[in-house]
Each structure stands twice: as C-alpha cells, then as structure tokens.
Amino acid sequence: GQSMADTFNMLRANDLIWSFFVNNYLLGKEPKPFDLLFWNSDQTRMPKALHMFYLRKFYGENALSKGELVMDNVKLDLSTVKTPVYVQSSKEDHIAPARSVYRGAKLFGGPVTFTLSGSGHIAGVINAPVARKYQHWTNADMPDTVEAWMTGTTETPGSWWPHWLNWLSEKSGGQVPARDPAKGPLKPLEDAPGSYVKVKS
C-alpha cells in the first residue's frame, strides 16, 4: 500500500511530498487536520504480486483497453459489456486524466454516461452536495474525444452526486427496506463499521 501511495505522490511531488517537507520539517509547522488527506493516507494493502500485475498489465501494457487482459483464462473485452455504465472523471486528476478515462469509457459496448467533475483525483470524487463546491459537466453525446465532448457540455455548479443519483434511480427498481444481517443465514462477524477499518496499513 505504501509503495503504491508513494508512486502516486511522486506524480505531484511538489504538492504531495515537498510541501510537507518544507512546511512540517524545515519550518516546523503542524499540519492542519484535513479529512480527505487523513483518509488518503490509509492505503489499501496489496500483495506484491498483485501490485506488479496491476502496474505491468494496466499501466505498462495497457492490456485491458487493447482487449488483451486475461483473468482466470478468460480474455476481458469491454466491448461485450452491454449494460449501462456511468463513468465519472475529474478535470484536474493527475492519476487518471480525464482524456484517458474518456477513452476507456468509449471501449464499452453499451450506453455510457460520462460526467466530468471539477477538482482532482480525490476531491473531485468525494464532493458531497452539502459542500456546494466545484462543478460538473454533462453531455448525453459521446463524440470521439473528450475535447469534442466538452464543446457540447452543460456546466452545473456543485457536486456530480445528484446527477449520478438520478441516473441510478432511472435504472433501479423501487426502494426496499434495508436487510437485517442478523436475520440472514450467516452470523454477523461484528458491528459496523468493522474492525478492519481501524487497521492502519
């Protein structure tokens, strides 16, 4: 997990490495509490073999987009996915640039809704409507490039979440009562949120 985080931090070293070195180490300033950065610093633990497979196949070889990725002897072909897909990208994302995400969205064989949000990799996604921050862009058409897509967009202030919720509601059945895990065939392990969320990597 830490190796993956270090890799992503190096993509924006001035903001995510050197600013902390200068402010915290050289100037002795205490870092201000920031919920998104606290959450971001709790990396996902990943076995080395999976980490290497992920980097090699998805970044080095771009195997999924080429239709060459094989999992358990099955070749994955996104063009065979015919169900509706909602794809969100962030305008200033340094890890998954909007141009790349858009190209990936074009690989699906069914209807795709692409939405672009303001801000970057984390704040562009984790943007609750109550915050009234940033904006998002929508366009029902999917032209060849994200630049062409942008020329036909509608800009809406605030979070992209309500747009996504409307999309989900149109494709979902009616609401049902939440299930009670204690009444299922398996005994619950423990109360929510679970001890695993308290484990630091």
Label each region the model flagged.
Residues L55, G104, W164:
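Hydrophobic, well-ordered secondary-structure elements that form the walls
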